[in-house]
Amino acid sequence: MSLSNSLGLLGRKVGMMRLFTDDGDAVPVTVVDVSNNRVTQIKSQETDGYVALQVTFGSRKASRVTKPQAGHLAKAGVEAGEIIREFRVTADTAGQHKAGAVIAASSVFSVGQKVDVQGTSIGKGYAGTIKRHNMSSQRASHGNSRSHNVPGSIGMAQDPGRVFPGKRMTGHLGDVTKTTQNLDVFRIDEARQLLLIKGAIPGSKGGFVTVRPAIKAKPQAAEGAK
């Protein structure tokens, strides 16, 4: 799937559960609410230099929206949302949508399709190198004093005489944008506009996520091919 034709949906992580296949196998799935994705703007090559669909999700009080954004949304005739994102698409895909229209889950995804899910990972505060970078602790005894769970020496010799940027050290863990790739769409609840995605996705319950067709999905082999 090319990035130039990857229309996706915005959603909210509801939580995890498990479903059963016809064979009785338990499958862990993440429930994502993708209801009421509204098109706020259709960007074209002539006016914007690229083709994209601007989509909003959720709802926000009118008093919490800036005047420029309120005017932008009023032009499209849509209710203010909590987040706005753009999806680069082809001109044909953009021509199939209109500003103010609602995008249904089944019109973008299908059962068994590979998707990439992007979200903000759970923030865990200030963490040490063992938890943050999976480093090993030092010896518990035999000459080690008060240096059990520390990274050890981080410096260099007199030359270069400094700590290189990017050195793995203690610091804030989590609360960063993460993408989980090549997950399967296990089921689509069209009545409630829910995506049931096999496996775990980044973020905590209630967090916003972006679901796109997988860009590294391997092509499906034709039936009967060896």
From Swiss-Prot:
Residue(s) carrying N5-methylglutamine: 158
Origin species: Variovorax paradoxus (strain S110)
Single GO MF descriptor: structural constituent of ribosome
GO biological process: translation
Cellular component aspect of the GO annotation: cytosolic large ribosomal subunit
Function: One of the primary rRNA binding proteins, it binds directly near the 3'-end of the 23S rRNA, where it nucleates assembly of the 50S subunit.
Domain of life the protein comes from: Bacteria
Region feature (Disordered): 135-158
InterPro entries listed in its UniProt record: Ribosomal_uL3, Ribosomal_uL3_bac/org-type, Ribosomal_uL3_CS, Transl_B-barrel_sf
Pfam families xref list: Ribosomal_L3
Protein name, per record: Large ribosomal subunit protein uL3
PANTHER family per record: 50S RIBOSOMAL PROTEIN L3, LARGE RIBOSOMAL SUBUNIT PROTEIN UL3C
